[in-house]
Amino acid sequence: MPELPEVETVRRGLEPAMAGRLISEARVNRPDLRWPLPPRMAERLTGQRVLRLRRRSKYILADLSGGESLLIHLGMSGRMLVSGARVGDFVHDHPAPARHDHVVLEMEGGARVTFNDARRFGAMDLVPTEAAETHPLLASLGPEPLGNAFDGAYLAARLTGRRTPVKAALLDQRIVAGLGNIYVCEVLFRAGLAPVRLAGSLGEARAAGLVPIIREVLSEAIEAGGSSLRDYRQADGELGYFQHTFRVYGREGQPCVTPGCRGLVGRIVQSGRSSFHCPECQR
């Protein structure tokens, strides 16, 4: 499933085609994705101007001139693809209609924005912009890891006394929004923390020290266009490249990249997810 860097990359890719532009026509090709699409969705979108595109955790929100916001969740295999007239650098020569093109937005200026989702685990909804943060998908989310509200004091306070593994704590969207399995594995490696270590055992300084590492990993991943492992593509159809710089994720049995370390990357399963780590470097 796309994590924060992938969703932010898609948001940035959509911006030239959508931000400030009118939706001249919307087409909905099926009534549901993961859940039923909102009633009269095509009618409610057509003629609306996109005021801005923003991201909350792993969700994209397009704020519309009529007072509603289009909430987009890519799910496991969803893609937002831009085709048609060249708008900025994010244009993909995407034939229409393709089999899994479920929602199509014809934009002012000639660009076409298509939501394509072969597995239909993605979702779309229309919500009042002023109440978007109360939507069930957003209401319980913690602060953004790249935002000002997420700092060392906050994270140290949230981890103090927690008797869950530090990996599980960082994946808890109520503590910090948008982190997923890939990037938490990479963060814990850089921090030298074993994924099974109890969050409450870190102490204030080590817990607070996770914040700059989280920011560093996410920023590097966004700069690389995210990580393409299976279905993820940028809005122009290109792959992300951060997977080529993974230090532990997906590297089971390979040598640790830490200079002087003779350990091999291991894999354990926590709550149904693979945790990649170096048993020598991470304690």
From Swiss-Prot:
Active site residues according to the UniProt entry: 2 (schiff-base intermediate with dna), 3 (proton donor), 58 (proton donor), 273 (proton donor)
The task this protein performs is described as: Involved in base excision repair of DNA damaged by oxidation or by mutagenic agents. Acts as a DNA glycosylase that recognizes and removes damaged bases. Has a preference for oxidized purines, such as 7,8-dihydro-8-oxoguanine (8-oxoG). Has AP (apurinic/apyrimidinic) lyase activity and introduces nicks in the DNA strand. Cleaves the DNA backbone by beta-delta elimination to generate a single-strand break at the site of the removed base with both 3'- and 5'-phosphates.
Record CDD domains? EcFpg-like_N
Q: What is its EC number?
A: 3.2.2.23, 4.2.99.18
Question: What SUPFAM superfamilies does the record tag this protein with?
Answer: Glucocorticoid receptor-like (DNA-binding domain), N-terminal domain of MutM-like DNA repair proteins, S13-like H2TH domain
The family assignment reads:
Belongs to the FPG family.
Q: How does it assemble?
A: Monomer.
| Protein name as it appears in the record | Formamidopyrimidine-DNA glycosylase
Entry note: cofactor: Binds 1 zinc ion per subunit.
Entries under Gene3D superfamilies matching the protein: 1.10.8.50, MutM-like, N-terminal
Per its Swiss-Prot or TrEMBL entry, what cofactor is needed?
A: Zn(2+)
A GO MF term: 8-oxo-7,8-dihydroguanine DNA N-glycosylase activity
Ranges annotated as spanning the membrane: none
Q: Which InterPro entries match?
A: DNA_glyclase/AP_lyase_DNA-bd (IPR015886), Formamido-pyr_DNA_Glyclase (IPR020629), FPG_cat (IPR012319), MutM-like_N-ter (IPR035937), Ribosomal_uS13-like_H2TH (IPR010979), Znf_DNA_glyclase/AP_lyase (IPR000214)
- What's an example Gene Ontology biological process for this entry? base-excision repair
The reactions it catalyses are: Hydrolysis of DNA containing ring-opened 7-methylguanine residues, releasing 2,6-diamino-4-hydroxy-5-(N-methyl)formamidopyrimidine; 2'-deoxyribonucleotide-(2'-deoxyribose 5'-phosphate)-2'-deoxyribonucleotide-DNA = a 3'-end 2'-deoxyribonucleotide-(2,3-dehydro-2,3-deoxyribose 5'-phosphate)-DNA + a 5'-end 5'-phospho-2'-deoxyribonucleoside-DNA + H(+)
> Key word Zinc present in the record?
yes
Q: Which Pfam families does the entry link to? A: Fapy_DNA_glyco, H2TH
As recorded in Swiss-Prot or TrEMBL, the protein's gene is named mutM
Provide this UniProt record's keywords sorted from A to Z: DNA damage, DNA repair, DNA-binding, Glycosidase, Hydrolase, Lyase, Metal-binding, Multifunctional enzyme, Zinc, Zinc-finger
Which residues of this UniProt protein bind DNA?
A: 100, 119, 162
Segments forming FPG-type zinc fingers: 247-283
